[in-house]
């Protein structure tokens, strides 16, 4: 073999060996740096959130809702000191302890000019703030502190106290939310005979859309104010 060629091959092997050693050294250095970070500054510990139950007599016993979603916390060690990376947030579930709130019955509709209604359109119930609501002056909606803009309902207040929030579902009304602010003789008499009748307020008797729907479900979302 040519001596010059042999020397060239030897030099090439030495060069490749140097590259391999250099690469290994850099890789090893990277491993050491990573190990140091994990070992001293980035040792993380997950702190699992807990579930806290709160009981509310204003909610029907058939309702359970999440008030606050839970978030796991994260802590880490830095120079021997435990620090918080993410604060733990406990999950909060509200459970109803009030009366069971599912009913079936009939939905009727009425205007403030109905027979026997207050001539000024005032409802039977006072609002949460103690004021009086007029269907003719203030309209057929009420701004509830929890549910926002809702329709006004008339119901038997011995069963559905003033301020009760009800969701109405039937073939014409899908998920309508209303608040009990009124009552009437028809609701009282219906309850005494064993069935549920709730009246939905309209601007006038002439604007009533549907005289009666006897296949209506009523879901109480909150009992009273």
Model-found features: residue ranges?
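Gram-positive cell-envelope targeting signals
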Residues: 1-32
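Detector for Asparagine
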Residues: 2, 7, 26, 36, ...
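Intrinsically disordered, low-complexity segments enriched in Ser/Pro/Gly/Ala and basic residues
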Residues: 3, 21-24, 77, 133, ...
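Generic low-complexity, intrinsically disordered sequence content enriched
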Residues: 9-10, 22, 27-28, 63, ...
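Extracellular modular ligand-binding repeats in secreted and cell-surface proteins
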Residues: 30-101
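Solvent-exposed, well-ordered loop and adjacent helix/strand elements within mature globular domains
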Residues: 96-225
